Amino acid sequence: MDVKSVLSNAFAMPITSPAFPMGPYRFINREFLIITYRTDPDKLRAVVPEPLEIGEPLVHYEFIRMPDSTGFGDYTESGQVIPVSYKGVAGGYTLAMYLDDHPPIAGGRELWGFPKKLANPVLAVHTDTLVGTLDYGPVRIATGTMGYKHRQLDLAQQKKRLETPNFLLKVIPHVDGTPRICELVRYYLQDIDLKGAWTGPAALELAHHALAPVAELPVLEIVEARHLLADLTLGLGEVVFDYLDQPEANAR
């Protein structure tokens, strides 16, 4: 393979059989259980990178079922998203996500900078309850429950919430272990067709784990719960802040 061929095929690894395809990345019947809770503000500030800003000390704990996604297949994801603002615009910062499918782990980390790890999340209806669980190895570290479709939510309002910007801290090391990429990335969910939105009574339990520290942001109070069903496209990202271009990087 000559240099021109390497460059023309340089999208993802392995170069002869990439772990994930080029987009667009469309999701059909993507189902969310989002439980918003109040947490310790000091612990929240310790994990949210500048220049993002936090307001109320809230966390969205999410269980997401994705049965039909372009190139990524059928999988489930779970993790924590923190409400933040950037230059006065409200959005969400993804702290960590845990999922059961390699292509979106590889693609998520390499393309956008999603902080993804391999685990075993489940989202399913059990009789009258929507139940989300997350196991890391043999250890249950998250359990979320919500009464199934107790009350409808306003679709236009919930769609507007899904359309707000999302932020990621993309970190990729150089071959010598020093940072090669250290960027704040912004992306949007696009072409959203919100098919349903509901709420109900909810509960969330988090357990401590050395390698999946979801409980480091403790649940102090449940604020709201949402069950959403949508078709949407995961848009590609843009770099809004490069940490390696800052004066602090030159002082390392």
From Swiss-Prot:
Catalytic activity: acetoacetate + H(+) = acetone + CO2
Entry keyword set: Decarboxylase, Lyase, Schiff base
Enzyme class: lyase
Similarity annotation: Belongs to the ADC family.
Pfam families linked to this entry: ADC
Functional description taken from the UniProt entry: Catalyzes the conversion of acetoacetate to acetone and carbon dioxide.
Organism per entry: Paraburkholderia phytofirmans (strain DSM 17436 / LMG 22146 / PsJN)
Residues the record marks as active site: 116 (schiff-base intermediate with acetoacetate)
E.C. no: 4.1.1.4
Gene coding for it: adc
Name of the protein in its database record: Acetoacetate decarboxylase
HAMAP family: ADC (MF_00597)
GO MF annotation list: acetoacetate decarboxylase activity
